[in-house]
């Protein structure tokens, strides 16, 4: 099955490059303050970043002592940008879908993934591979769009006739699978799965859950127009798990 790669489409990539997180990096990501506190010690570690995008997390790991980092992404455009912004002798970038990554068993200390797993159809297959790649005691830290956010599919508020927000729709929650949604004005394929599926898949494949967080906007951002509405429903789910 051909995997969707919207980020190599020029129009979509141009729109993505204008996003705050694309321009400001980790500090421009609303969840970063929370996610950073979930990260393990990187000193002398072998690190894998699945869906590395511009390479922000790759560079962070190296800056915090990682011995080597492999950043993978399906998008050649993303990796070209990563090499421009975050080239480092300790970072290797590879253009490959995360489901097709091939690594020797028990060779990775830390695996990171930021807002990428919801593009993967076969989540359990990926987690099985991650469990194989990680050394005993190795750590997986990832963020995904929250199941409440992905369930109904439109990923948009319901508005009244005056254009005021009424509520956020949650529907078809237990019907997992493909969702066609709008992102940056384009139709994008994502995959919805329940909170139970995310967490139990980890537990059933040799992981111990260490942290599960639904991040809220930092207090200092709540005065930004529209930001208070982000307190009405979770958008992201952050998980840290350790291979037993």
Question: What are the residue ranges of the model-derived segments?
Answer:
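Short alpha-helix
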Residues: 189-212
């Amino acid at each position: 099955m051909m995997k969707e790669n919207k980020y190599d489409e020029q129009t979509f990539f141009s729109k993505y490059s204008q996003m705050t997180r694309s321009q400001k990096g980790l500090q421009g990501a609303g969840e970063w303050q929370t996610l950073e506190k979930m990260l393990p010690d990187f000193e002398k570690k072998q690190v894998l970043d699945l869906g590395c995008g511009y390479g922000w997390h790759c560079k962070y790991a190296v800056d915090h002592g990682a011995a080597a980092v492999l950043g993978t992404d399906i998008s050649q455009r993303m990796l070209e940008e990563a090499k421009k912004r975050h080239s480092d002798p300790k970072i290797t970038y590879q253009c490959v879908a995360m489901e097709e990554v091939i690594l020797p068993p028990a060779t990775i200390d830390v695996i990171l993934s930021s807002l990428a797993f919801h593009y993967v159809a076969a989540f359990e297959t990926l987690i099985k591979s991650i469990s194989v790649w990680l050394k005993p005691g190795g750590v997986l830290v990832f963020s995904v769009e929250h199941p409440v956010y992905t369930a109904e599919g439109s990923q948009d508020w319901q508005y009244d006739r005056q254009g005021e927000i009424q509520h956020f729709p949650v529907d078809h929650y237990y019907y997992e699978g493909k969702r066609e949604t709008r992102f940056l004005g384009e139709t994008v394929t994502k995959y919805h799965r329940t909170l139970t599926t995310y967490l139990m898949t980890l537990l059933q494949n040799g992981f111990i859950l260490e942290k599960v967080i639904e991040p809220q906007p930092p207090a200092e951002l709540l005065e930004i127009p529209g930001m208070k509405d982000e307190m009405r429903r979770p958008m992201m789910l952050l998980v840290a798990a350790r291979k037993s």
